[in-house]
Amino acid sequence: MQFSENALLSIIVVIASDTTEPQANVSLLTGCLDALSRQVNPPPMEVIVPYHQRVVGIDSLRGRFPQVDFVLVNDLKAWSRAGGSREHHDELKSVALKKARGQIIGFLEDNEVPDLNWCAATVDAHKKEYAGIGGAIENKVDRLLNWAVYFCDFGRYQNPVIDGESAFASDANVSYKRSALEAVRPSWEEGLNEVTVNAALTSRGEKLALSAEMVVYQQRHGLRLGPALRERYVWGRSFGAVRCQVMSFPARLALAAVSPLLPGLVALKLGMTAWRKRRNFSKFVQAFPLVLLLLMGWGFGELLGYLTRRPA
């Protein structure tokens, strides 16, 4: 890992696996940091891991990865301390971004293991004029529940991903030019959510893109159905609440009205995407009952997000 005070690339890794748990650990984070430490032809870079006080195991990682900047954040406003929320992830990203020194800012989650060429591919992708560039996401745990969660979250980011301009990019594997983020600083000053930030960027005429070379592998070992369902609800409600900030009242009511239809419609869209990519379609078919169940959890959360304008 080529760490430098004059970093070209700053990578912010958020511990997102604590959405439904009051206490997080670093079991997934270790794999992510290990991959970052073994990058091929890396640019001058830094890695920042913001965390709250209930993350267990940080001290052991400090010894293993001494060049990583582990940042304790004590004053989180949105953290429930009891599990069942994700808004504190946005706060953690905002705090880390204010510390970052790179010209390019990358965001990863602890359960994503980056390809060993990820850093080089990210810097290369930013030679183009896009403000934000997302990458491909693959599943590496061959269990039906993992496939179901993967297809619900990241099916459209499965390679082959078409390089070039895109209307979306996942916050689990994305990078931005620092200059573009600074231009929309009010949108992430208190918390960085990709829906709000991307809307702010595109409203300025900036463009987003996808790169098939920026690959990460989702490795969520130990997934259980109950927590996975609760996670869908929490994230769906957060998504609905955040979208309320960038849409009109009539649009909000219209989305709330059609929310009960979303699980079926989204399941159909996910199936079409899996078929079109010609990869892992049989896994989608096998996992379909779980996919539909998880989408129902998300849809209920999204509906409440639209109605209450509040996350879980």
Model-derived regions: residue spans:
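Conserved nucleotide-sugar donor-binding
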Residues: 101-102, 170-183
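Short aromatic/hydrophobic "clamp" motif used to bind/position activated sugar donors
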Residues: 105
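Conserved donor NDP-sugar-binding/catalytic core segment of glycosyltransferases
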Residues: 113-146
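Short, flexible, basic/aromatic active-site loop/helix in glycosyltransferases
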Residues: 136, 149-167
